């Protein structure tokens, strides 16, 4: 593939929030998630896990948790903020309409730059807001979005469900993911 072809492919990919009522085959889900294996990460840690959900009842339950947590904030907020959040609510729960959501989890950062400096007695910069695992998640999510596009699907990367219901979603899905992982992103996939 030449650079112009690749650039056009990148330009074609866009985020979508509305989906046709079409399912996604298990084979396509596996192929899309398999593309994540080839994502570079710091020290090749590949600090991510995925939970793919096609069950509409479960998708709706997760969306309900996000909206319920948002609504629980309303009594403590000024009316104009509540009105703004009500308009914004669609973006928090539009994943209800997706035939597939991929929840992205990453390991909890337990080895900081400070510890590396201490353990190896070397001078390193102490970058602000540096989290190797989250940088890797950004790369892996992008690969999944591009894989969706290549497979003929549309997708959207969401982080707001994390803001409003991270702990509740982690608790609800604890049988699928280890304790040392945090829910950090959600990807919707459909046609």
Question: What kind of feature is each model-predicted range?
Answer:
Residues 1-31, 46, 177-191:
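Specificity-determining recognition surfaces
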Residues 34-37, 85-90, 170-173:
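Glycine-rich, charged/polar anion/phosphate-binding loops
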Residues 36, 102, 118-169:
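Small-aliphatic-rich amphipathic alpha-helix that forms the alpha element of a beta-alpha
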Residues 37-44:
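Glycine-rich phosphate/pyrophosphate-binding beta-alpha loops
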Residues 45-47, 95-100, 182:
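Short connector loops at helix/strand junctions that flank enzyme active sites
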Residues 52-137:
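Glycine/small-residue-rich phosphate/adenosyl-binding loop
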Residues 71-81, 171-191:
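A glycine-rich helix N-cap at a beta->alpha junction
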Residues 106, 160-161, 191:
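Short secondary-structure boundary segments
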């Amino acid at each position: 593939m030449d650079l112009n072809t690749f650039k056009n492919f990148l330009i074609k990919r866009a985020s979508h929030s509305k989906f046709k009522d079409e399912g996604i085959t298990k084979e396509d889900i596996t192929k899309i998630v398999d593309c994540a294996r080839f994502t570079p990460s710091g020290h090749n840690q590949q600090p991510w896990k995925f939970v793919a959900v096609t069950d509409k009842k479960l998708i709706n339950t997760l969306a309900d948790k996000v909206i319920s947590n948002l609504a629980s904030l309303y009594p403590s907020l000024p009316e104009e903020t509540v009105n703004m959040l009500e308009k914004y609510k669609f973006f928090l729960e539009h994943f209800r309409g997706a035939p597939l959501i991929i929840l992205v989890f990453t390991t909890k950062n337990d080895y900081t730059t400070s510890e590396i400096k201490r353990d190896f007695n070397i001078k390193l910069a102490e970058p602000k807001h540096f989290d190797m695992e989250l940088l890797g998640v950004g790369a892996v999510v992008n690969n999944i979005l591009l894989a969706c596009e290549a497979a003929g699907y549309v997708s959207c990367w969401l982080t707001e469900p994390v803001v409003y219901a991270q702990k509740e979603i982690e608790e609800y899905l604890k049988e699928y993911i280890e304790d040392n992982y945090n829910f950090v992103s959600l990807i919707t996939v459909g046609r």
